[in-house]
Amino acid sequence: RENNLSARVRSFIRGGVKDEEDALKGARDIIAEQVSEDERSRNQIRNQFSRQAIISSKVVKGKEEEAAKYKDYFDFSEPLKRCTSHRLLAIRRGESEGLLKVSISPNDEECTERLERSYVRGNNECSRQVQEAVRDAYKRLLKPSIETEFAALSKEKADEEAIRVFAGNLRQLLLAPPLGQKRVMGIDPGY
């Protein structure tokens, strides 16, 4: 089979394809694109993110003094599903100010193993090429895409929670008696 692969690859060497390695790289890129566009693959990775994603933040080198108000997040790591909304919003604020570097990531090895179980069959040169393509699909295409998706979703949930808390606090302020514990018989609106 491996000789067969080499012969098959040589048939694609023409035009912009210089050698066998170029042809194999092109084939791996095509496979990686197909894996990343497959809804089943995307759902597998989404499930991994929702179950075990970790949000991590680190201070940007050289900005330690400027980022002092974010010192709690200089070397921070926590499961995303347990990260409170105010903490997530603070981390994102530090990131948008260019003071923190933030990532959301599941266990990369477990994700690639799941994808490989879906796509890699056998143990030969062909399967090794497919395995390499699957790992590339995860690292270069799937992970960044799903990470962006989860960053947006988690920010949206945190924003909704912050609005809910703010609305509750505002309601309590508006419903509070205007003069505290003092009794009021009436208020003259013309005064």
Predicted regions and their residues:
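Duplex nucleic acid-engaging cores and interfaces of nucleic-acid transaction enzymes
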Residues: R1-L179, R183-M185, Y191
